[in-house]
Amino acid sequence: MTIQTSRTLSHSLGSRASSSAVAYQTECVESHRDDNGVHYGKFALGPLERGQGITVGNALRRVLLSNLEGTAVTAVRIAGVTHEFSTVPGVREDVMEILLNMKELVLRSSSPETQVGRLVAQGPGEVTAEKLQLPSDVEVINPRHHIATLAEGAILEMEFMIGRGHGYRAVDYSDSKAMAIDFLQIDSVFMPVRKVNYAVEAARVGQFLEKDRLVLEIWTNGSLTPQEALSQAARILVGLFAPLQEVSFDAPVPPKPDEDNQKNQIPIEELQLSVRAYNCLKRAQINTVADLLLYTEEDLLEIKNFGQKSAEEVVQALKARFGLTLPRTREKGKA
């Protein structure tokens, strides 16, 4: 079924409205949906300034293919099955084929939470997606999608997890929750947009070909219409660039260097002490100015072979070279 449409919307380029602002239009040139549920839409945007066609087209294409949220089956549990390389009695397809068929289901959900669907089918006959038991806010878009073929008396019973996400998610074997309850995980394709093409044409304004016209083609899996996909992509881009309108141009203030901390890391060799005083401090495991500042003058006198003359030498060196002083005695109540 093909529906030809021509819907035009006017937009204004520019941060403020004025008579010099450039108006452009978005037109849905064509829209149709095939028997497989693939929805196609063709849009024309223009006139744009020269060079903006590629900029807008490339940005929209990337967002459409990778940033739109979709719904997919993430794991399946089949009664009597412990691994994907087994078979189900009376079912033509092996477990791997059933998992691949479940992977190709097209679903639409309004809930951000992981949900559980079920299937109980008895042969003989073909099992299609319309026989799935789904939560109330989950809809199957391709109800005629084939899942399995059952022989006389065969029973296929399964549960499957339904989740939302972006892009493509490979099997995560570290997901202990799913592994612990015997679910077989499958690679999930959340992308509602299957394909995007764009082309930039010259647009005539007056007598001159001085503008761009962007032609955008979008194919979706049917869970979104191309119009909805384009609208969502535009909102994502607006949200991405909006914070740039409030950029602060104030230069960041560099942090002040911690001069005291730098001094504290200086080795005691910089004090240029006498050999006697230096050796006594080293034997007491005093290696830096930071270590030395933990002592009082009285504490220094308690170091073996460290006399009053050596203590005065240390105090004078600290004062002369770094402007630091040692207290004479330790305050009461402090260790």
Curated annotation (Swiss-Prot):
GO biological process: DNA-templated transcription
EC code(s) of this entry: 2.7.7.6
GO cellular component: cytoplasm; DNA-directed RNA polymerase complex
UniProt keyword annotations, A-Z: DNA-directed RNA polymerase, Nucleotidyltransferase, Transcription, Transferase
InterPro entries reported in the protein's UniProt record: DNA-dir_RNA_pol_insert (IPR011262), DNA-dir_RNA_pol_RpoA/D/Rpb3 (IPR011263), DNA-dir_RpoA (IPR011773), RBP11-like (IPR036603), RNAP_asu_C (IPR011260), RNApol_insert_sf (IPR036643)
Stored Pfam families: RNA_pol_A_bac, RNA_pol_A_CTD, RNA_pol_L
An MF annotation (GO) of this entry: DNA binding
Stretches the record annotates as Alpha C-terminal domain (alpha-CTD): 256-335
Reaction catalysis annotation: RNA(n) + a ribonucleoside 5'-triphosphate = RNA(n+1) + diphosphate
TM spans (from-to): none
The keyword DNA-binding is assigned to this record: no
Enzyme class, broadest EC rank: transferase
SUPFAM superfamilies: C-terminal domain of RNA polymerase alpha subunit (SSF47789), Insert subdomain of RNA polymerase alpha subunit (SSF56553), RBP11-like subunits of RNA polymerase (SSF55257)
Gene3D superfamilies in UniProt: 5' to 3' exonuclease, C-terminal subdomain, DNA-directed RNA polymerase, insert domain, RNA polymerase, RBP11-like subunit
Spans annotated as Alpha N-terminal domain (alpha-NTD): 1-248
Similarity comment: Belongs to the RNA polymerase alpha chain family.
Annotated domain remarks: The N-terminal domain is essential for RNAP assembly and basal transcription, whereas the C-terminal domain is involved in interaction with transcriptional regulators and with upstream promoter elements.
Assembly notes: In cyanobacteria the RNAP catalytic core is composed of 2 alpha, 1 beta, 1 beta', 1 gamma and 1 omega subunit. When a sigma factor is associated with the core the holoenzyme is formed, which can initiate transcription.
Function (record text): DNA-dependent RNA polymerase catalyzes the transcription of DNA into RNA using the four ribonucleoside triphosphates as substrates.
Name of this chain's protein: DNA-directed RNA polymerase subunit alpha
Organism: Synechococcus sp. (strain JA-2-3B'a(2-13)) (Cyanobacteria bacterium Yellowstone B-Prime)
Gene from which the chain derives: rpoA
